[in-house]
Amino acid sequence: MAETKTKVTLVGTVLAKPGTEFVYEGESPECETCKVKKACNNLNRGHRYRIITVRSTHHDCAVHLNGATAVEVMEAPVTMLISADMAMINSKIKVEFSCNKTECRSYSLCRPDGVVEGEKYVVADVLGNASDICGKGRALKLVEIRPA
């Protein structure tokens, strides 16, 4: 599978460390008048990113206490549980969150941060069976997915 391209964006200076992962939540109201807001808000809302490289460029920021620093990011893989019949390496899946059992121990793996419902992803790796039995009786596999 081809490597994901990197993208330059701005993040809070405190977070600007290689390997740090974050989920982009979108533009804040404080960004409205910022002259560099396009550089900060150039990612896909709800997607998980990993910082690859930290650059030396720094800007004052109304959102981040210590300002914002330029970084190179790539979309990070996400580990989640999916139906066993969809868990095939390199297969494309459309994520649909069909379970609302928030008390389930596997809930955070069935509905992980950084995955957008309705979007398509590629199964990059099948990591194994679910560690817990699904409360809805479904056969689940633990997989690593990337945006399609």
Curated annotation (Swiss-Prot):
Q: Which InterPro entries match?
A: UPF0179
Entry protein name: UPF0179 protein Mboo_1959
The lineage is:
Archaea, Methanobacteriati, Methanobacteriota, Stenosarchaea group, Methanomicrobia
Q: Which family does it belong to?
A: Belongs to the UPF0179 family.
Q: Which Pfam families match?
A: UPF0179 (PF03684)
